[in-house]
Amino acid sequence: MDIVKVCPEIQIAMDIDSGLIAEMRKDILVVDLHPVEDEINRLAQYAKALENSLDPRNSPMKAYAGREGTYKLAGMFQGMFFGFWVTMAILVLVTILAVKMNLSLIGL
């Protein structure tokens, strides 16, 4: 928001963006809100990317082209990874329990 002083003697200024000519007053503060608006737009873009990350069919915000389904694939591999380790833990516990119940399994 740029302001040009048309006549400094009688305190008249013109807003370049709108072409409005008005009296300059000391009790009014003029603030440029364009940086704030840019920051709000950037935060809105991040919020939209976060919202899109909840749908596994969408690609991440700064991903290369053709990366649709990344979240779906990651979710599938995560389930397989944790499922494998949980199954292994249960298998070890069952094996230890079976050996303690029947010591003849290990030759004692």
Swiss-Prot record:
This is Tetrahydromethanopterin S-methyltransferase subunit B. InterPro entries: MtrB_MeTrfase. Belongs to the MtrB family. The chain crosses the membrane at residues 79-99. Coiled coil: none annotated. Pathway: One-carbon metabolism; methanogenesis from CO(2); methyl-coenzyme M from 5,10-methylene-5,6,7,8-tetrahydromethanopterin: step 2/2. It catalyses: 5-methyl-5,6,7,8-tetrahydromethanopterin + coenzyme M + 2 Na(+)(in) = 5,6,7,8-tetrahydromethanopterin + methyl-coenzyme M + 2 Na(+)(out). Its main location: membrane. NCBIfam families: methano_MtrB, PRK00965.1. It is found in: Cell membrane. HAMAP family: MtrB (MF_01094). The gene is mtrB. Part of a complex that catalyzes the formation of methyl-coenzyme M and tetrahydromethanopterin from coenzyme M and methyl-tetrahydromethanopterin. This is an energy-conserving, sodium-ion translocating step. It is an enzyme of class 7 (translocase). GO terms for cellular component: plasma membrane. Pfam families: MtrB (PF05440). The lineage of its organism: Archaea, Methanobacteriati, Methanobacteriota, Methanomada group, Methanococci.
